[in-house]
Amino acid sequence: MYTVDNYDVIVIGGGHAGCEAALAAARMGHRTLMATISLDNIALMPCNPAVGGPGKSHLVYELDALGGQMGINADATAIQMRMLNMGKGPAVHSLRCQSDKIKYQHLMKQTIENTENLNVKQIMVTELKVEDGKVTGIVTELGEFYGAKAVILCTGTYLKGKILIGEIDYVGGPNGQRVAEHFSQSLLDNGIELMRFKTGTPARVDKRTLNLENMEVQEGDTHHHSFSFMDEWINRNEDVCWLTYTNKETHEIITSNIHRAPMYSGKIEGVGPRYCPSIEDKVVRFADKERHQLFVEPEGTSTNEMYVQGMSTSLPMDVQYAFLRTIPGLENVEIMRPAYAIEYDCLNPTQLTPALQVKHIEGLYSAGQANGTSGYEEAAAQGLMAGINAALWLEGKEPFILARSEAYIGVLIDDLVTKGTNEPYRMMTSRSEYRLLLRQDNADMRLTEKGREIGLVKDDRWAKFTAKKAAIDEAMDMLRNTPVNPSKETQALLESLGTAPIRTGIHAYDLVKRNELSYAIVADAFGLKRYTPDVEEAVDISITYEGYIKKQMDQVDKVRKLEEKILPKEWDYTEIKGISLEAQQKLNKIRPHSIGQASRISGVSPADVSVLLIQLEQYNRSK
């Protein structure tokens, strides 16, 4: 075995988790190696050519506020942007961008290759080296050894990946890539528990063979949007998508061939994603539905490949052609890449600490689909946190852990390490108890200061953040201190604004509270200073939802007390009398960081928590 080099951090994988992990560790000053199966597929988007959407966009905004890369990349390579859920409250507003996937890859590769302290190599890792419970490095298929103080697993869907299309299956990764066939065994040999999951992707079709006039045009917003708080608000609406639907004939073809689908024939062992079902799943599970919605989306500005969103399948090619050609707009479609299902190994995430470190192997971290999640955004968020925590661990500092009340990233990681998952985990706004506090628009106000303390928020971002914060404070003070008296002129002005008259003197702040008014309307009417749209939006939301926000903050204060009660790492819960056998087993397996985390474990009752509180109090008194 030939020793090539030694690094502070080695990141295994060059997907969305790997990119953020490697960038974070390197930017925090640690010599880092990214080991990827293919240099040509760094930050590959093997499924939908898009970033964001409900719940997912919140992760991207948070990642950006902490100093991550995905938001900047998504903005720079977007070809269409839409703000979803605008008919609902601001807690669930979600930005989604259609990406030029090729440009996205190229820009991320360029960023990786030009980051100080970061090397990237095309390497197939076959073995993880561990000595005395501590990671020491990796071995490649060519017999090379790379030493490392910390290793981050970002293996995606490449561990023993298997492609399934109808009756055919073969070893392979997304887009026909190689897979890591032997690395799973090395993880097992080191006591790491693996699961088998499955996901899938639709066919890519040739735009030249589509009848676009038979589909509805789906345009982007004309409003200014961006994921990154560093970005200028510019219009990104270069391309359109198309909307179409399946029909009775489509469903009949799928139903009559359902026995040829690997999921139904028994060929697939892995568990698939609940919230991204295949078309055959949808047809079977929702047999009463006459049609299912599809979006036909461009994969970029320099290709004719189109992504058929909503048509993930693993049916054979002849069936794929047959049912696609029953759909309006796809009557003459030609498939450029087939739809397929992919099975892969991943870690049981309950083996991880909230810092994403494997509990029984010092210096080993894991992030992304390797932890049982689905989606680029979930992967990137975990990658950033794993990279940060590996760097902090090397520096002898406390881990960086976000609470559920602080970020969707905190919700994501807490769900994984506390509850685990038996299917690919997808982030949704409904998973958070504090949705109104964790909006995408205020991610910078919540997290930029934390990113600054860590060292990922540089001076330019910090200057922008402090200027915005000062502007919000200034606007709020101005509204609170601007009197509005019930004069005839004022009453006439209010009537012209379509709002009720006032009986006594109030302040401009009280007017902004009214549903039909906003900061912009009040400012123009009363000659107040105007601000940038993001500042005015923050002011509007803070004032309109003031009462609800206060209620959630009170809830957070109550929960925080339990989160601050840290449990000793050395406790053997089987020796604690008064808690149930199930609680003892679950607590010993998950080894929660705090009383708060323990209270969220399935099988740990309020009575068990009460016993733990008493035991912890006695333990702390005896120290």
PLM segments and residue spans:
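Beta1/beta-strand and adjacent pyrophosphate-binding region of the FAD-binding site
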Residues: 3-17
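Conserved N-terminal/central alpha/beta ligand/cofactor-binding core
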Residues: 6, 23-127, 142, 154-171, ...
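Short hydrophobic core segments
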Residues: 12, 145-156
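An anion/pyrophosphate-binding glycine-rich loop and adjacent beta-alpha core
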Residues: 38-40, 83, 185-321, 418-491, ...
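Conserved beta-strand-loop-beta-strand element in the redox core of flavoprotein oxidoreductases
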Residues: 129-145
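A glycine-rich dinucleotide-binding beta-alpha-beta segment and adjacent secondary-structure elements
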Residues: 307-373, 401-414, 532-586, 591
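Internal hydrophobic alpha-helix adjacent to the cofactor/substrate pocket in enzyme cavities
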Residues: 379-400
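Extended, charge-enriched "interface" segments that sit outside catalytic cores
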Residues: 431, 448-453, 457-610, 614-623
